[in-house]
């Protein structure tokens, strides 16, 4: 019967296919789907023990998954599965235990889902990096170079095609494309942020590992339920764990609280395990067994969990140590004794953040090495034992003798030293205090008296060590504080009314540029973009290519640079705020000065010539001696001043075009008197001049650190010489160029007749 039914079904499919040619592929597709689903149903029954409701479980995903999720396919949409909704559940539930053929289908679908291309180079993308889908190579390239002040140069046509092969050949075009597609350099983390993220991930990983251990499986407890108590020793008092308090540099508060708890009757010390998660019941060390104790770790008495990672109390071994030997020490009139140099170094080494000096004078720090003595007894000369704990982990050690859990705690008497003038019954050992072995005797108000004396010791000895110059902690770095507004009094680099009065450089300053300063530098680069674009035609190009250049050719070459300076000025937002008369005054007074500053980057001292990349594929140079020799009689004095001006700039500045751009903008935005500028223009120009000078100072600091002060202090003298050069340059071409031989724009600045 089943066989006949199958034959009839096949015949009906053939008839339907012959009648409807458009549905030729549909029976084949349905037959494949039915076969695949039958195979999956049989395979899941034989090999999988999946609960019936497991099909509804959502797929797990993590935020660190680098896969770029694409929209669901059409086949997975409701109503497009061919049959009923149960078919969809069969496909979903077969992901974990499907056949090899199903794995191939799933892997092919997964590979199609993963096929995303990098927006920069077109390579295989791994995820969203800095706001754009990119590959790992472009992600690393952008992180390394987006915040660098270094200016890349394109070795080709400034318009390179970036793909997976050519991306290595041109860094400038690759970085420009990164910004073009929308990558944001503000999303790059600095070293401090990377360190915090790494620590956070390590903490999360450690927490997950502890929770995943078999011993950590505990039954859930309500908020008001008490932790599990061992039935072996019901008389042992177990206290719930307390939240850890932040560590402070003064340990007296922790000492006082712990000592006050020690004087309470019927109180047992809290027994806890080392810091971290506590997956084991808290019981007495005597009655705990292997099943309820952590492996290879013994329960110890620790105050608030502030102990060494090894999980032992250093003071336990201190009680077994032999009594310390005493040596004679030099005494002071105030009843103090002087610590030895080695002991003083050890004391400083226990202060968080303190630096032990390598060489120490025996007489200079005598007031710091002085400590109180008890009735003339000298201080112990023992060095720090191997079991001593750091000063930040000091705790009061006690010997408790309890028979039934109801007797009071009896504290053993130990050798101690007291401040002169106080009773010898209530005292503490200063030397032991420095080694983390503080013991106390007495009761009642003894704790308060001891607390006062400990504070006095802290003020007299430890605080003086902290206040010493070699132990001062560095001040907060202002440059690392994020700022919201640019050019405000709270900004990273200060807006100075007189930028030439540079304050003395402070030590331990982070000279890294912040986001606002980097944005301002990007605006400067954008304004000068295209300054070195190659020429292709025109009379100026013929002047560039001549081997023997005339004064008219020199003016035509300067015409190209002058026109590009005008384009740069129009690209500066502050220049557009100036009135039309003010713009003319700025360009007329600053054009020759900007040409001279431009010569700083083009002058080659080895060949004594100016070199320019304006002509593509041509090495164009103009010899300085030949150029000034063809001008009038005043040219030689002008040449000497120009060479002197070039000498004010270091070689690092001459090679850094961005620094020279900032100098050129500061020269452009200078108050001019021909023609006179109105009051509003003077205000705008003055603010912009100070702005670019302050930005230049910060940029130099980011490159040279403390050496930037020496470089920046030479700029005012260089600008003074620049003004003198510009005043005497107008007559250089007088009588050497005929009318019509040169372009008109240079004739506005240089007189030819």
Curated annotation (Swiss-Prot):
Biased composition (Low complexity): 212-227
Keywords: Developmental protein, DNA-binding, Metal-binding, Nucleus, Receptor, Transcription, Transcription regulation, Zinc, Zinc-finger
UniProt-reported outcome of changing residue 137 to F: In m421; no transcriptional activity in vitro. Defective dauer formation
Domain of life: Eukaryota
Cited PROSITE patterns: NR_LBD, NUCLEAR_REC_DBD_1, NUCLEAR_REC_DBD_2
Outcome, altering residue 562 to I: In m25; defective dauer formation
Predominant location: nucleus
DNA-binding feature ranges: 115-190
Name of the protein this chain belongs to: Nuclear hormone receptor family member daf-12
Organism this protein belongs to: Caenorhabditis elegans
Gene behind the chain: daf-12
């Amino acid at each position: 019967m089943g066989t006949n039914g199958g034959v009839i079904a096949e015949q009906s499919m053939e008839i339907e296919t012959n009648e409807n040619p458009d549905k030729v592929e549909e029976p084949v597709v349905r037959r494949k789907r039915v076969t695949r689903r039958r195979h999956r149903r049989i395979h899941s029954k034989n090999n999988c023990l999946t609960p019936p409701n497991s099909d509804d479980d959502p797929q797990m995903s993590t935020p660190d998954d680098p896969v770029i999720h694409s929209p669901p396919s059409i086949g997975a949409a409701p109503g497009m599965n061919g049959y009923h909704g149960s078919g969809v559940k069969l496909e979903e539930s077969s992901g974990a235990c499907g056949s090899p053929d199903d794995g191939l289908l799933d892997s092919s679908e997964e590979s199609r889902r993963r096929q995303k291309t990098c927006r920069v180079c077109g390579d295989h993308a791994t995820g969203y990096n800095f706001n754009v889908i990119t590959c790992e190579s472009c992600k690393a390239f952008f992180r390394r170079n987006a915040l660098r002040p270094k200016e890349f140069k394109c070795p080709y046509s400034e318009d390179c095609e970036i793909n997976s092969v050519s991306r290595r050949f041109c860094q400038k075009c690759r970085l420009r494309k990164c910004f073009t597609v929308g990558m944001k350099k503000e999303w790059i983390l600095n070293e401090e942020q990377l360190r915090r993220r790494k620590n956070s991930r390590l903490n999360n990983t450690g927490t997950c590992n502890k929770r995943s251990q078999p011993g950590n499986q505990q039954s859930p407890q309500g908020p008001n339920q008490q932790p599990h108590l061992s039935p072996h020793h019901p008389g042992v008092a177990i206290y719930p764990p307390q939240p850890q308090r932040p560590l402070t540099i003064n340990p007296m508060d922790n000492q006082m609280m712990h000592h006050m708890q020690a004087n309470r009757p019927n109180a047992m010390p809290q027994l806890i395990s080392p810091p971290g998660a506590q997956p084991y019941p808290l019981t007495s060390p005597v009655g705990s067994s292997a099943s309820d104790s952590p492996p290879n770790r013994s329960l110890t008495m620790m105050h608030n969990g502030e102990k060494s990672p090894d999980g032992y109390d250093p003071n336990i071994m201190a009680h077994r140590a032999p009594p310390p030997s005493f040596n004679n020490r030099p005494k002071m009139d105030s009843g103090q004794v002087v610590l030895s140099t080695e002991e003083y170094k050890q004391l400083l080494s226990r202060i968080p953040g303190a630096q032990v000096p390598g060489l120490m004078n025996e007489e200079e720090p005598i007031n710091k090495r002085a400590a109180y003595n008890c009735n003339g007894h000298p201080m112990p000369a023992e060095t720090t034992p191997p079991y001593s704990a750091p000063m930040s982990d000091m705790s009061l050690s006690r010997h408790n003798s309890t028979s039934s859990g109801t007797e009071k705690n009896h504290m053993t008497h130990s050798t101690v030293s007291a401040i002169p003038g106080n009773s010898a019954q209530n005292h503490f050992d200063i030397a032991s205090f420095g080694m983390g072995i503080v013991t106390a005797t007495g009761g009642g108000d003894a704790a308060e008296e001891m607390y006062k004396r400990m504070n006095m010791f802290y003020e007299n000895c430890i605080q003086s060590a902290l206040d010493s110059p070699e132990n001062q902690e560095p001040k907060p770095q202002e440059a690392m504080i994020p700022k919201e507004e640019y050019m405000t009094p709270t900004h990273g680099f200060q807006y100075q009314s007189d930028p030439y009065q540079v304050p003395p450089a402070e030590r331990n300053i982070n000279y890294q540029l912040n986001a606002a300063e980097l944005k301002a530098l990007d605006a400067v680069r954008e304004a000068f973009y295209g300054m070195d674009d190659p020429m292709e035609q025109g009379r100026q190009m013929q002047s560039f290519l001549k081997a023997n250049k005339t004064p008219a050719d020199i003016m035509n070459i300067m015409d190209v640079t002058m026109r590009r300076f005008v384009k740069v000025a129009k690209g500066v937002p502050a220049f557009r705020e100036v009135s039309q008369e003010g713009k003319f005054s700025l360009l007329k007074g600053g054009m020759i000065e900007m040409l001279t500053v431009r010569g700083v980057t083009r002058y080659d001292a080895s060949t004594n010539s100016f070199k320019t990349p304006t002509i593509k594929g041509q090495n164009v140079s103009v010899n300085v001696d030949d150029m000034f020799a063809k001008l009038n009689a005043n040219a030689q004095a002008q040449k000497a001043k120009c060479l002197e001006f070039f000498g004010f700039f270091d070689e690092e500045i001459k090679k850094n075009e961005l620094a020279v751009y900032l100098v050129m903008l500061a020269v452009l935005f200078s108050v001019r008197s021909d023609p006179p500028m109105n009051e509003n223009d003077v205000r705008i120009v003055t603010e912009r001049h100070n702005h670019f000078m302050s930005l230049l100072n910060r940029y130099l600091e980011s490159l040279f650190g403390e050496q930037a002060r020496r470089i920046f202090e030479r700029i005012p003298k260089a600008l003074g010489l620049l003004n003198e050069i510009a005043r005497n340059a107008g007559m250089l071409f007088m009588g050497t160029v005929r009318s019509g031989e040169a372009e008109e724009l240079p004739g506005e600045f240089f007189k030819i007749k």
